[in-house]
Each structure stands twice: as structure tokens, then as C-alpha cells.
Amino acid sequence: MNRFTGKAAFVTGAGGYIGGTIAKMLAKDGACVAVCDLNEETALRTVREIEEAGGRAIAVACNVTDSASVDRAMERAVTAFGRMDILVHAAGGSARSAMKPLIEQTDEVIQSVLGVNLLGGIYASRAAAREMVRQGEGGRIVNISSVVALEGLRGCVEYAASKGGLIAMTRSLCKELAPCGITVNTVAPGIVQRPGETNDAVHTNFLGIRCTAEDVAHVVLFLASDEARFVTGQTYAVDGGRSLAMKGTD
């Protein structure tokens, strides 16, 4: 039996590279997946790939910066699957800001980055936690942060703040939800490369290899599984050791 047979998952940003890979791997391992994305077309593309592989999924258009939109999306997922067991907040790719000193950054970019990365995580976690608490069978919440939140990086102040906020939220929320058997953890990837990309990212980690979305997804699936039942409030860096050498300025 697959690890997630009988489980329902809600993945934000699942029309993107990392979120889509996580959604597909959850489905391959037996989960029913709500593929949530601001862009419904990209969500549908992920759903088609899941269905072609024999999995079950629905596409849900969702603006994670709007709490009402998140609540509606969660309601639709629960209606479709009858339950909710796993949340992965992976939305954020479209909110990446151009690297600029904070004194040059615009309000629009700052609000967008904080809205998608941090507020989106808070809204999605609240919606999922409500369903998990109501069910009374525990659950798993996994937020996608970044190694930038661990060590800082010039030109990314608002991005680091938003991803660092997810880590702080994880540490607090895990304490609130622990009595309900719900774990909350964070995964902090380094530079994740798409197939065919070539750049110097391979030189920014100790292992000297490229990080793929699958590398991130493997850790997410562990944290979403029963194998991680005794793991909560933690942040897992998936970066080949890069965060150990960043020193805030690299």
C-alpha cells in the first residue's frame, strides 16, 4: 500500500515547478490532491499529469493572499475528497522579487512577496487546521521556506522576511496543534534548478550537484507521512550545505 492511500492533500502553488512536483509525488504515493494555484490553467496541467499517471486530483483556482479565496478552495477540496490530511504551502514562485536593496524596493513588490509567501501560509494553515481539528485524526502541515530565511541575503530583505516568517509561524503553530496530533514543519530549499537550466548554482553548495524539485519533494513527503509522526516545529534545509556558507552576504 502507498503511504498516502486514503489521505487528502492540499498543495498551494501546485501549478509551479516545486509545488507541481510535490503534488504529483503525493498523488503517485496514493494521496488525493487538491492542486491549487492562482493560474487555473497551470493547475489543470498538473492535474492532467496526475490523472495520466493514474492518480486522483482536482484543480482549484486560489489566490492565497485572499483568506476568503483560500477558505473556498479548502471547502471545495473537502467536498471533493471528504477529508483533509495534508497541507503543503508551496505558493511563492510568482512573488519572488527582483534583487534590490530595501531602500530601492517598491511597496507593491514588498506587499506581493509578504502576501503570497507569508500571509498565504497563514491563511492556508488556518483553513487546513480547522478541517484537521474537526476531523480529530491528526494531520500534517508543511511550509516551503528558503535558506535565505536562515542566513539572510543582500537584495532579498522582503523575501527573507516572508520566508523567515513562515519558520516562526511553524514554531508557534506546532505548539497550538500538537494536542490535536497535527505536526507543522518547514522545508527550506536552496537554489532549485529546472531541467535543462545551466548556471553556477552547482558551485554554491558543498555537494557540487544541482538541487531538483524532486529533492525537495522527497523531504516534504517524509514530513507529510506517518514516518514523521514525532517530528514537529522543525526546519529542514535542502541545500547541499549552502546555508552553512552564506554568511548573510554571499
What are these model-predicted stretches?
Residues A98-L102, T106-Q111, A201:
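Substrate-binding pocket helix/loop in short-chain dehydrogenase/reductase
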